[in-house]
From Swiss-Prot:
Designated name of the protein: Pantothenate kinase
Record's catalysed reaction(s): (R)-pantothenate + ATP = (R)-4'-phosphopantothenate + ADP + H(+)
One Gene Ontology term, aspect cellular component: cytoplasm
Cytoplasm as UniProt keyword: yes
UniProt: ATP binding residues: G95, S96, V97, A98, V99, G100, K101, S102
Molecular function GO labels: ATP binding; pantothenate kinase activity
The EC number(s) this enzyme carries: 2.7.1.33
Alphabetical list of SUPFAM superfamilies matching this protein: P-loop containing nucleoside triphosphate hydrolases (SSF52540)
Transferase as UniProt keyword: yes
Length: 316
């Protein structure tokens, strides 16, 4: 089969960086360099150029989709003769540990909330829906943190389902990376946002992952648009190790940090531990649970060095 025939058969439209950047059209830049600095992750070089060439075209596309969804809701209300409840448009962001999902989520939240409609955009990470450490220890799952079985999936699905059902408000637990645990009584209330951005490792999982349980309900069943942030395995590993080293010099120095003992490690020891954590936990989770869901995404952003996106694939 020729490369041209393979391209025609793919469910995705493929864009290089230059082609994607051209789709920004005339969307104005609404973020300053100072704001971008606050939005980026500890390990990322997020530039004004990256926001302009990658995230502004994406926010334009999402705005079209969201506006179309609102029109569809209005048609349904007109047909039923009702004043409908506010149903949020849900965007999910998946990808490996250290790929930059959180930065993507924060940038999109900032951009989408600054469209002329001034939409209310909430951001929730699925980390909060991890079982507390006490439960994970009891079940022998501390080394499986981030794997599907480490989450309270019932509560996560109920949270998303409630919002899609138009309930006035729903609560989401909050996770602290400092204490490496869910914050007791630290729930966040989400009250009928226009847009919900849900960021997490496994938000693209579906019934295809559980063929033995056809009645299982998944977060992906309630998502309107899904994004997978992708990068080559070797880059992910280096980003994870570099992030660990930065935490060793920063967050781990806090006496309250769960990983405070790591602050005393030499650089060589820290690299060895980070490499082991990557190989034994995060790489395994990526290969077994995260990467197999990539082709279900509405859009795949592929990163190269310095967290710069060099390819975008959009589902037809």
């Amino acid at each position: 089969m020729s490369q041209k025939e393979q391209t025609l058969m793919t469910p995705y439209l493929q864009f290089n960086r230059h082609q994607w950047a051209a789709l920004r059209d005339s969307v104005p830049m609404t973020l300053t360099e100072e704001e971008i600095t606050r939005l980026k992750g500890i390990n990322e070089d997020l530039s004004l150029e990256e926001v302009a060439e990658i995230y502004l075209p994406l926010s334009r596309l999402l705005n079209f989709y969201i506006s179309s969804n609102l029109r569809r809701q209005a048609v349904l209300e007109q047909f039923l003769g009702t004043n409908g409840q506010r149903i949020p448009y849900i965007i999910s962001i998946a990808g490996s540990v250290a790929v930059g999902k959180s930065t993507t989520a924060r940038v999109l939240q900032a951009l989408l909330s600054r469209w002329p409609e001034h939409r209310h955009v909430e951001l929730i990470t699925t980390d909060g829906f991890l079982h507390p450490n006490s439960v994970l220890k009891e079940r022998g799952l501390m080394k499986k943190k981030g794997f599907p079985q480490s989450y309270d999936m019932h509560r996560l699905v109920k949270f998303v389902s409630d919002l899609k059902s138009g309930v006035p408000q729903a609560t989401a637990p909050v996770y602290s990376h400092l204490i490496y645990d869910v914050i007791p009584n630290g729930d966040k209330t989400v009250a009928q946002p226009d847009i919900l951005i849900l960021e997490g490792l496994n938000v693209l999982q579906s019934g295809m992952d559980y063929p033995h349980d056809p009645h299982h309900v998944f977060v992906s069943d309630f998502v309107d648009f899904s994004i997978y942030v992708d990068a080559p395995e070797e880059l992910l590993k280096s980003w994870y190790i570099n992030r660990f080293l930065k935490f060793r010099e920063g967050a781990f120095t806090d006496p309250d940090s769960y990983f405070h003992n790591y602050a005393k490690l030499s650089k060589e020891e820290a690299v060895d531990i980070a490499t082991s954590l990557w190989n034994e936990i995060n790489l395994m989770n990526l290969k077994e649970n995260i990467l197999p869901t990539r082709e279900r995404a509405s859009l795949i952003m592929t990163k190269s060095a310095n967290h710069s996106v060099n390819q975008v694939r959009l589902r037809k």
